[in-house]
């Protein structure tokens, strides 16, 4: 049997981390079994579904490289198919038309609640033989079995059972002729030959209804697996303040897709004590029986740690392709400066996100208008004039511009003046970067370049001279 899974989001908002994790688990299960992964857009909620949300879902899936083998399918383009199946069910007697008014249904609901009963349809039209005009408004309900129970073996939670007496007759077509969500899902899973449905635990109560409809259609019943919810680190339902933002917001905030995928796969699944997983390892090791039944806690610090790891572990040339977008957002012209792959090597240890990296690198490519006030006050003092002049001249004399030779020039300056490296290094750092912090000074000066470094040292010497004149 060919394994076939699906990810079926509703395009009423962005692709959030919970949806992304569900997509990842479905994708991994299919890949682990050499099966196929289907993308289906469940856009039957015409009022809330938007083209922008569909685009956001696609963008998120593509950024995470969760490529689909079929689709995307759109439910709104399949209404003829759904209605044909409903008409077939009406003929076979597994569905019936219901003419009950909203007023009757509301009165029934209030009466049941007053008695402490669970609100449910009482089946009046199921057994009615009244004649109705063809154009009289009605809904179509599924004739749910009235005896027995529905049992399914959830691949994460184990056997789950629902009594059919707890399930009323579900509306499968509205008065306007549009099919309802639970029915569309059933027909889609049937037509698309889905073998395994992996989705959030909020769908557990839909499952017995969907199984009963599938059985009425004499269609195969897929295997179900319901993934637990994601909470914030305080144990409360995940919300924006915990980090429940769109997948693309993580891109905007400077995270690598590998980091987010690695974080999401471990958010409810484990393989021994291993924390770092390549995509290939995820595919190789992923099983549903290793997915936890308990809710997972979202921890931004852990995600940040993983991101820092991947910035330094992945090939710099690859990381640079993602950094490029952030550089463009900062409007930095990188034509006159180090290659982005070299920048990744320079700043990788210091920066935990690509956004931080893009906001920390401008001095490598563009001259700064002024020095950081605190750094200049502390390090660009008259006592720094001589070290800067000497190191400038030694840098100017370098014929083979390498980080090693830059280091020798700084060391030689300290030796010549009989001062510690800090007496040379700190003024030089402020002079060439405009600030008091940077990667190792020799590689920083080397990356900035010989001509630009000397020009900036001269600018710092002018700053010191002006400072002296003002005293």
Swiss-Prot record:
For this chain the motif 'KMSKS' region maps to 237-241
List the GO terms this entry assigns under cellular component, sorted alphabetically.
cytosol
Q: Does the keyword Transit peptide apply?
A: no
Single GO MF annotation = ATP binding
Q: How is the cofactor bound?
A: Binds 1 zinc ion per subunit.
Catalytically driven reaction(s): tRNA(Glu) + L-glutamate + ATP = L-glutamyl-tRNA(Glu) + AMP + diphosphate
Q: Which Enzyme Commission number(s) are on file for it? A: 6.1.1.17
Hey, what's the signal peptide range on this chain?
none
Note whether Lyase occurs among the keywords. Answer: no
Which cofactor is recorded for it? Answer: Zn(2+)
EC class (word): ligase
* InterPro entries tied to this protein: aa-tRNA-synth_I_cd-bd, aa-tRNA-synth_I_codon-bd_sub2, aa-tRNA-synth_I_CS, aa_tRNA-synth_I_cd-bd_sf, Glu-tRNA-ligase_bac/mito, Glu/Gln-tRNA-synth, Glu/Gln-tRNA-synth_Ib_cat-dom, GluQ/Sye
What family does this chain come from, according to its entry?
Belongs to the class-I aminoacyl-tRNA synthetase family. Glutamate--tRNA ligase type 1 subfamily.
- Self-association or partners: how does it assemble? Monomer.
- What protein does this entry describe? Glutamate--tRNA ligase
Q: Which gene encodes it?
A: gltX
